[in-house]
């Protein structure tokens, strides 16, 4: 922060041909001490990126100038949250807003064969059914009408059997094609050290796929009009979501405005982004503001999961019980996309091809912190996961650390 602040002060000083010492900063606005000139950080940058190297000599803000640090500051949001006045994502409304419920296939990779909406049309408040390839939703004037219409609608799917049996998950995981092998640590002669050890200890640890299971299922509101889209969402990554929505809606990302609204949180990525994609695409297809509220079954069934992890470990001890060899193998998902590239359900089902899935840094803490004479740690990055994945955020990877 000090380096960035100093760089911005220097830029303002150069613009005005004054000394940096003659400038002050308050609430992101740079002013001359005389008060005759002022400019905000954002106006000074004028859309340019701030690429600054860390300057260890950049002056720190004097503690006497601190207005908040060290003070007991009242939380302005707490009273409304305690009394129920606070506006959460699930409470957000727009004038003329319609309500949609998503109709999903019974399993991954399902293809929509036919739709019979005759019963759904009889629901009071029914508006229409929208479909784009395998993306299917029912739109109504109220949320309860959407729930009833979704239950009444009959869809026929063709669903391939692509998932392994639960009991055979880790055998399946171990046999998946490997995209990349990495030797994290390799010291000494692990083969001979283990062969000559007085005692060998082996263990295998498996970590099941996990859902975030936020207390409130995902919700989003979108309003597509005039060739652009505004989305209200509790997404933690609105910048990445903006890029993905651009692909789904086939419009420039500059035409998409993301507005954050507090919702049920998670450490990683749950269904907020996917629900936002649902709302945006349905709004585009019906030409009206749309609210999409996932049910608990939607959240647990269709949010991206943390991928499984499989860890094989073996140690060799000498006659005195001291470790002389350590070998570990990690079978983890290969993140073949960046954080900017996570395939939304709306993209997958509407026929938009997206590459990659983001899994987080699953290799963290695969290395050994202890000093042993013979160590071999390998990471096998698997080419596929069979289902959409995301990061269950534990910087340091709880499964690796536990093992």
Feature-to-residue mapping (PLM):
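Structural alpha/beta core scaffold segments of enzyme domains
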Residues: 1-403
């Amino acid at each position: 922060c000090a380096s960035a602040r100093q760089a911005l002060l220097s830029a303002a000083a150069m613009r005005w041909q004054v000394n940096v010492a003659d400038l002050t900063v308050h609430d992101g606005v740079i002013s001359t001490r005389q008060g005759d000139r002022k400019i905000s950080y954002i106006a000074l940058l004028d859309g340019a990126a701030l690429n600054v190297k860390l300057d260890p000599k950049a002056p720190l803000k004097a503690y006497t100038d601190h207005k908040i640090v060290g003070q007991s500051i009242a939380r302005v949001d707490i009273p409304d949250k305690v009394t129920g006045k606070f506006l959460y994502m699930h409470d957000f409304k727009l004038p003329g807003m319609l309500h949609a419920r998503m109709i999903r296939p019974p399993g991954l990779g399902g293809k929509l064969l036919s739709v019979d909406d005759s019963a759904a049309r009889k629901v009071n408040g029914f508006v229409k059914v929208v479909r784009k390839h395998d993306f299917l939703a029912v739109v109504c004037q109220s949320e309860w009408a959407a729930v009833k219409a979704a239950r009444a609608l009959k869809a026929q799917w063709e669903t391939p059997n692509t998932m392994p049996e639960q009991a055979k998950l880790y055998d399946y995981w171990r046999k998946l094609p490997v995209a990349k092998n990495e030797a994290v640590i390799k010291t000494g002669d692990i083969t001979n050290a283990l062969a000559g050890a007085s005692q060998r200890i082996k263990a295998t640890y498996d970590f099941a796929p996990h859902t975030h299971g936020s207390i409130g299922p995902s919700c989003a509101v979108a309003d597509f009009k005039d060739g652009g889209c505004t989305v209200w969402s509790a997404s933690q990554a609105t910048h990445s979501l903006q890029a993905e929505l651009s692909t789904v809606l086939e419009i420039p990302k500059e035409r998409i405005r993301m507005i954050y609204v507090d919702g049920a949180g998670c450490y990683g990525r749950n269904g907020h982004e996917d629900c936002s994609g649902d709302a945006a695409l349905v709004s585009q297809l019906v030409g009206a503001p749309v609210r999409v509220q996932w049910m608990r079954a939607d959240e647990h069934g269709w949010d991206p999961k943390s991928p499984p992890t499989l860890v094989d470990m073996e140690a060799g001890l000498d006659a005195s019980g001291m470790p002389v060899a350590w070998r570990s193998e990690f079978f983890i998902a290969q993140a073949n996309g960046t954080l900017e590239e996570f395939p939304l359900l709306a993209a997958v089902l509407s026929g938009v091809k997206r590459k990659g899935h983001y899994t987080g840094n699953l290799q963290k803490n695969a290395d050994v912190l202890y000093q042993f004479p013979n160590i071999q740690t390998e990471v096998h990055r698997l080419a596929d996961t069979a289902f959409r994945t995301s990061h269950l955020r534990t910087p340091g990877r709880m499964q690796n650390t536990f093992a």
